[in-house]
C-alpha cells in the first residue's frame, strides 16, 4: 500500500468508457482510493493507457509511458543509434551488446534506447505509481509490430533496488546503469513536466551511495552513473573515467573489459 503523504495524495479514476473495473483493480493493487476530493494527483485509466495527472489550476499535462509514438519513438528512429553517449557509456561496440540492469528505471526511456540497440535489459523501479505507468507502457508496446521485439528484451521488477540487487539470483548483469534522482537542469518542457510531477512522489535519492555500492558488488563488468554535467560524483568509490555531454555526464566504474560474445565463448571453451 502506498503511503499518502502531504502534497502527494493520489486517487484512481477511469476516464475511458468501461474502465471502471480496471481502475478498481489498480486501486486495490496500489492501495489507493477511487474517490478523494482532496487528492493532489489522479492515476487515470484512459483509452490511450494509464497516465498520471497532477490536479489543480496550474498543473502540467498528464504523463504516460509511450514507446510506440512521441519522443521515445523519435529517439529510436533518429537518435543516433550506437553513436549515442549512453551506448558508449554501457560499452556497446561492434559485436558487444552487454546485459544491462537499469536500477533506476523511471519511465523506461534509457532502458528502451539500450534495448532498441540490442541489449537484454532488466529494469527496477521502486516507486509504485511510476512502476505502474511503466508496466502499462510495456504491455501496450508489447503488441506493436515495430517495437514489440524491443519490449521483449525488457524485464520489469518492482521494489527497492538495493534490496533486489543484494538478493539477486541467477546470472548477474554485465553492466548496471544508475540515474539517481537529482535536480535536473534540462530545459525541455517534457523533462520539466515529469520532474514536477514525480518529485513530490519520489524526492531525491538520498541512498545513492548505498545503491552504487550494491551495484559495484553485483555488476560483472562495469557500473555507469548518469549525472547532471556539473553535479558531484556519488559519495564513495570514484569513477575510473567519465563521458561528458552538453547537459549530462556518465561516470564509468570499470571492473572488467567487455568482449565480443564469440571471443567470450571461445575463451570459456
Curated annotation (Swiss-Prot):
Binding of S-adenosyl-L-methionine: at which residues? 125-126, 179
Q: Which GO terms describe its cellular component?
A: cytoplasm
* EC id: 2.1.1.242
| Main localisation | cytoplasm
Lineage top rank: taxon: Bacteria
Question: What Gene3D superfamilies has UniProt attached to this entry?
Answer: Vaccinia Virus protein VP39
Question: Is the keyword rRNA processing assigned to this protein?
Answer: yes
**Keyword field contains Acyltransferase:** no
Say which enzyme class the record assigns.
transferase
Location comes to: Cytoplasm
Q: Which Pfam families match?
A: SAM_MT (PF04445)
Q: What terms describe the molecular function in GO for this protein? A: rRNA (guanine-N2-)-methyltransferase activity
Give the catalytic activity: guanosine(1516) in 16S rRNA + S-adenosyl-L-methionine = N(2)-methylguanosine(1516) in 16S rRNA + S-adenosyl-L-homocysteine + H(+)
Provide the alphabetized UniProt keywords: Cytoplasm, Methyltransferase, rRNA processing, S-adenosyl-L-methionine, Transferase
The family line of this record is:
Belongs to the methyltransferase superfamily. RsmJ family.
What role does this protein play? Specifically methylates the guanosine in position 1516 of 16S rRNA.
Recorded hits in HAMAP family, A to Z, give: 16SrRNA_methyltr_J (MF_01523)
* PANTHER family hit by this protein: RIBOSOMAL RNA SMALL SUBUNIT METHYLTRANSFERASE J
**Protein name in the entry:** Ribosomal RNA small subunit methyltransferase J
Amino acid at each position: 500500500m502506498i503511503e499518502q503523504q502531504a502534497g502527494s495524495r493520489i486517487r484512481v479514476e477511469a476516464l475511458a468508457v468501461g474502465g471502471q473495473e480496471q481502475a478498481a483493480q489498480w486501486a486495490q493493487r496500489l492501495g489507493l482510493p477511487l474517490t478523494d476530493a482532496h487528492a493532489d494527483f489522479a492515476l487515470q485509466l484512459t483509452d490511450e493507457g494509464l497516465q498520471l495527472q497532477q490536479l489543480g489550476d496550474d498543473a502540467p499535462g498528464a504523463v504516460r509511458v509511450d514507446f510506440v509514438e512521441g519522443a521515445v519513438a523519435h529517439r529510436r528512429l533518429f537518435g543516433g543509434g550506437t553513436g549515442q553517449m549512453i551506448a558508449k557509456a554501457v560499452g556497446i561496440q561492434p559485436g558487444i551488446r552487454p546485459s544491462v540492469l537499469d536500477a533506476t528505471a523511471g519511465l523506461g526511456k534509457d532502458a528502451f534506447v539500450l534495448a532498441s540497440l540490442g541489449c537484454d535489459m532488466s529494469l527496477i523501479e521502486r516507486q509504485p505509481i511510476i512502476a505502474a505507468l511503466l508496466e502499462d507502457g510495456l504491455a501496450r508496446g508489447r503488441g506493436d509490430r515495430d517495437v514489440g521485439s524491443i519490449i521483449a528484451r525488457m524485464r520489469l521488477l518492482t521494489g527497492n533496488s538495493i534490496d533486489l540487487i543484494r538478493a539477486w539470483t541467477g546470472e548477474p548483469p554485465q553492466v548496471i546503469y544508475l540515474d539517481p534522482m537529482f535536480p535536473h537542469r534540462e530545459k525541455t518542457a517534457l523533462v520539466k513536466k515529469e520532474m514536477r510531477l514525480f518529485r513530490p512522489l519520489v524526492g531525491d535519492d538520498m541512498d545513492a551511495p548505498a545503491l552504487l555500492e550494491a551495484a559495484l558488488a553485483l555488476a560483472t563488468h562495469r557500473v555507469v552513473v548518469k549525472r547532471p554535467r556539473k553535479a558531484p560524483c556519488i559519495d564513495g568509490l570514484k569513477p575510473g573515467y567519465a563521458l561528458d555531454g552538453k547537459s549530462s555526464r556518465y561516470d564509468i566504474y570499470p571492473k572488467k573489459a567487455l568482449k565480443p560474445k564469440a571471443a567470450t565463448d571461445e575463451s570459456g571453451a
